[in-house]
């Protein structure tokens, strides 16, 4: 990364960082896509089981990753402020937190989740598939969190092409393992939907292996000496990471868990509706890679400019990110509307299920426009390390507004589609409030056009 002067130079740097991130995100989300489609091709019960299992894993995955991603703006600001020597300790303390969280999460999976599954409104077969799916995921939870720290470290330096290469190397391996474990090919046990969990868990370890190799062989990464001895646990650094990470993680948790809650509530409408909801939701997740990548890019660039005390440049990057996100939202909405029948065909050959999926996809268009506004705002706020209010806004918007609206509409002629209208309502409310917040945050940051000093 480097300082830029013109809008043209900023667009170029934005796209240089954004493009590898979006390829990485699309590839990562394709793992969920292939888990869903390959499980659906095995059976509707397998698809429903993976949907329920994912409804547990997705919010935890996203929330804990969001917590660990706190090192991205921290390191980006350190780089901008020319304090590179502090980077190694930041990464190490992030790894300490990651391993602790992994241990806690594995305990919860084996001690708490089975009890929850027995009380859910789904068949015993679907619950059993979900349980084994999550057990498979647990194999790779430590690796997943370690890789989240390493990926954040690499991205915060603006070296997003490296994480792209890591992901591109590992996802084909995941697809191959899905083929083996779900369908029992090449002498592997036929595990159905649960097999996709084991495939994903094993793949996470490959991600760590490839990450370590690249960090050790790339000069721009090796110079930080991340793997040259362990630094001491610093409670001040732990406090900084948690101070940013917890609100950030809660924001993501409130957003992803609301989708998981809706998946569980869909159980009242039957297995077929759960399967259709999960299929359409996996498409939305895939498309969400674009606005999410805009947010990640703004966190990196905004953090870098904030560390260098250049508020004007940080604001200009936010404007660029907003323009890019709105354009992406329009394109994604058009894809969902005009190609919904083709998309549904990827998931099932059942006409009734295909019709349900197409209906969900129409309502998903609303998500695209809400995310186009919300994602860049969240990314900018993370770059400024202003994340406390976002978690409060997320809880109110999603759980106190979005879910009640959706629940009420589900008793009308809209049925299960009412939940998706409720979800969209929550996203729009959050986007509106946080758009005001980011402007106020920028007003509070005092910068001198030359030396610039930030005051919070």
UniProtKB/Swiss-Prot annotation:
Localization (cell): Cell membrane
Residues that span the membrane, as ranges: 13-34, 54-76, 95-117, 132-154, 161-183, 193-215, 244-266, 286-308, 321-343, 358-380, 387-409, 414-436
Name of the gene: norM
GO terms of molecular function: antiporter activity; xenobiotic transmembrane transporter activity
Entry GO terms, CC: plasma membrane
Single biological process term from Gene Ontology: monoatomic ion transport
PANTHER family: FMN_FAD EXPORTER YEEO-RELATED (PTHR43298:SF2), MULTIDRUG RESISTANCE PROTEIN NORM-RELATED (PTHR43298)
Cited CDD domains: MATE_NorM_like (cd13131)
Protein's UniProt name: Probable multidrug resistance protein NorM
Function noted in UniProt: Multidrug efflux pump.
Family assignment from sequence similarity: Belongs to the multi antimicrobial extrusion (MATE) (TC 2.A.66.1) family.
Keywords: Antiport, Cell membrane, Ion transport, Membrane, Transmembrane, Transmembrane helix, Transport
NCBIfam families: matE
Membrane topology: Multi-pass membrane protein
């Amino acid at each position: 990364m480097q300082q830029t002067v013109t809008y043209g130079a900023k667009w170029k740097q934005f796209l240089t960082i954004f493009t590898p991130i979006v390829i990485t995100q699309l590839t990562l989300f394709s793992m969920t896509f292939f888990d869903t489609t390959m499980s659906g091709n095995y059976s509707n019960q397998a698809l429903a089981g993976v949907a329920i299992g994912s409804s547990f894993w997705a919010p935890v995955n996203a929330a804990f990753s969001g917590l660990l991603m706190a090192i991205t703006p921290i390191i980006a600001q350190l780089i901008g402020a020319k304090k590179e020597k502090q980077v190694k300790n930041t990464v190490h303390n992030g790894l300490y937190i990651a391993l602790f969280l992994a241990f806690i999460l594995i305990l919860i999976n084996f001690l708490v989740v089975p009890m929850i599954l027995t009380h859910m409104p789904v068949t015993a077969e679907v619950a059993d598939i979900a349980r084994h799916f999550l057990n498979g995921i647990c194999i790779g939870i430590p690796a997943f969190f370690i890789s989240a720290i390493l990926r954040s470290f690499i991205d915060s330096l603006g070296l997003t092409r490296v994480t792209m290469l890591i992901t591109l190397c590992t996802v084909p391996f995941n697809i191959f393992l899905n083929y083996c474990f779900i369908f029992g090919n090449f002498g592997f046990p036929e595990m159905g939907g649960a097999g996709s969990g084991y495939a994903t868990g094993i793949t996470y370890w490959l991600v760590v292996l490839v990450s370590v190799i690249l960090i050790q062989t790339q000069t721009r990464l090796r110079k930080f000496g991340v793997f040259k001895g362990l630094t001491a646990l610093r409670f001040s650094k732990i406090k900084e990471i948690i101070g940013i990470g917890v609100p950030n993680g809660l924001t993501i948790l409130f957003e992803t868990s609301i989708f998981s809650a809706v998946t569980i509530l869909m159980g009242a409408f039957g297995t077929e509706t759960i399967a259709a909801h999960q299929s359409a939701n996996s498409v939305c997740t895939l498309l969400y890679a674009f606005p999410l990548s805009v947010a990640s890019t703004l966190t990196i660039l905004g953090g870098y400019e904030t560390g260098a005390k250049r508020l004007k440049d940080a604001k200009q990057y936010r404007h660029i990110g907003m323009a890019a996100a709105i354009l992406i939202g329009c394109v994604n909405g058009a894809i969902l509307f005009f190609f919904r029948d083709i998309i549904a065909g990827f998931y099932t050959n059942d006409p009734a299920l295909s019709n349900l999926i197409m209906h969900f996809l129409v309502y998903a268009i609303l998500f695209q426009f809400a995310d186009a506004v919300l994602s860049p705002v969240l990314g900018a706020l993370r770059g400024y390390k202003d994340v406390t209010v976002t978690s409060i806004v997320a809880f109110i918007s999603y759980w106190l507004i979005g879910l009640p609206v959706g629940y009420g509409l589900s008793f009308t002629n809209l049925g299960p589609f009412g939940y998706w209208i409720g979800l969209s309502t929550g996203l729009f409310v959050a986007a509106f409030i946080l758009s005001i917040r980011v402007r106020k945050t920028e007003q509070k940051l005092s910068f001198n056009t030359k030396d610039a000093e930030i005051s919070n």
